[in-house]
């Protein structure tokens, strides 16, 4: 699951990366504390990029949904955990790895959020296997 960092926030002593994907796209961490490795792809690769500083930070990762449980870094029981990641900035891409198999089939349109595209990576090659849902797809089949 490839997400974009939309905000970097501090709450008390904890730092949060807020991304544009929520538990509606990957429910496993919220449902039972499933662990997914994460990696960062910096948008800015220049010499002043935070990711190139070598600095690493303990961060919690959350989504945009209006639910306190919209946290990708939680343990079984719903406790917020952190991950050691390179320093991130708004616009960087955060990859939540090993999200395949159950990612799409457990996804929902909660909060009227369209589902993301699905990409299969095999042998170092990526290909689109399901297109991103459009607003038209989201409301298809509804009548007023």
Q: Model-flagged regions — what are they?
A:
Residues 1-144:
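Charged (often Lys/Glu-rich) extended helix/loop segments that serve as interaction or gating elements
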